[in-house]
Amino acid sequence: MLESVGISRIITLDIHSEQIQGFFSFPVDNIYNSNIMSKAVSDKYNVDDLQVVSPDTGGVLRARSVAKTLGVQDLAIIDKRRERANESEVLNIIGDIDGKVCIVPDDMIDTAGTLSNASHALKDKGAKEVIAFITHPVLSGNAIENINSSAIDKLIVSNSIDIGDKSKKCPKIDVFDISPICLLYTSPSPRDVVPS
């Protein structure tokens, strides 16, 4: 169906499930925005002070990619149980986070309940700071209240979803402009331009 209207390639930004790429008969490129957002901390911290933490087992590839971008050798993983949507319980943290600035990359944040629980668990286990990189800030329901009362020190979100004045209600939120990334990946390269 998409081919019938001239679409020959799709570019996604932190796709929620990479398996979706296999459902198309043409290339689907996924850009890990959290790698680009990692520049927001790479100049502020010594790499030895950082620990990248996957918020769950499903986010390990994203976290490993961010760790590689930052030059962080090890990875920590939050083992959690999810009873229902927007509710989770941290069972264990696998990896060394004591005294570390923990970077938690994820594709989206909805009510912030899961990230709030994770931030408290990380601080309880000795994390010095918790910084989250989130590509798609849904921020529904009581998300702002959850973030404000969480142990998150900084929440860096992209502007893939306009959050309006929510960042004014939460001093922990920094918005990262992704328009240069979108321009880079959507501008035709010289080989794609048809001479007139």
Where are these regions (language model features)?
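PRPP/pyrophosphate-binding module of the type I phosphoribosyltransferase fold
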Residues: 4, 42-43, 48-168
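Short acidic, glycine/proline-enriched helix-loop-strand junctions
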Residues: 18-40, 145, 149-154, 160, ...
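Conserved beta-strand scaffold positions in the cores of enzyme catalytic domains, especially
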Residues: 10, 28-30, 52, 75-77, ...
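Single conserved hydrophobic/aromatic residue that forms the stacking wall/gate
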Residues: 185-196
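Proline-rich low-complexity regions
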Residues: 27, 55, 188-190
